[in-house]
Amino acid sequence: MNRFLFPRLNSSIIRLCYRSTSTNFGLTNRDRKRFYKKVSVVESSQIPTKYEILLDQHKLKTPLGNIITIENEFLALALAQEWNQQYKKIDLSSMHLYSLINTFIDNPLKFTKNQLIEKLMHFLDWDTLLYRSDQPEELRQLQIKSWDPILLYINKEFHTNFQSTYDLHIKDLINKNDRYIIEKYFLNFDQSSLNIILFIVEQLKSILLTICLLKQYRSIENIATLSRLETEFQISHWSNVEYYHDYEMMDICSKISAAYLIFYCLNNNITRTILTNETN
């Protein structure tokens, strides 16, 4: 059984976070003392093509008691590193990878693939980029400058005709053909990926920005800023709470980073061999 051990002080993978209320060890969202000395990744004895995480000799499980098995080696290493970065205390609220992986393994709400797509399409009807503010004029111009290139990219990439409006009461802003094209795009992904996509959409309140992220059209930081354009505008003009603003941006970026890392690993076969070859 191959085993990859992690030194306690290794911090090569960024700490990514999300809320989790409990684990198979009975932990709650409160900090608990670290009870394990080392974290390791092992090949699954049941499924050799998958990997498991060991805390000392204990297999890591989900809140519902399912052993966490991961097909992608790099994702398993990242999850192990997240546990390894808990030093004296275990801060579950900071462990976004663990929480997101729990969600698509346990599927606590029992969503089917079609139900996940239906929930995603609901966000399209009220996409942040499509419904805009016409006042003040400075904000209106900022939206045009910042969001119009995104719409142009989506329309060119998918041969759609998405258009924005300043009328919040307009009905049927999105035509049936455009809805069908976006829905067909999501049908390409499996249920685990759709769970992750839904999480990103819920953070950004925008399917169109999420698609740009999935296609690597813009950086995570830029996507997060675009999703909060009106908030950023208000803060820049009237807010003096600089540190709270920085915390909010770091929080949303860390959550989206964790989700995108999982999405990318689920849809790409990344191994330590590939990473080693690319860095040499």
Spans of features found by a protein language model:
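N-terminal mitochondrial targeting presequence
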Residues: 1-31, 280
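An N-terminal structural lobe/cap that precedes and organizes the functional/catalytic core
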Residues: 22-110
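Short cationic amphipathic helices and targeting signals
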Residues: 66-70, 128-131, 138, 209-210
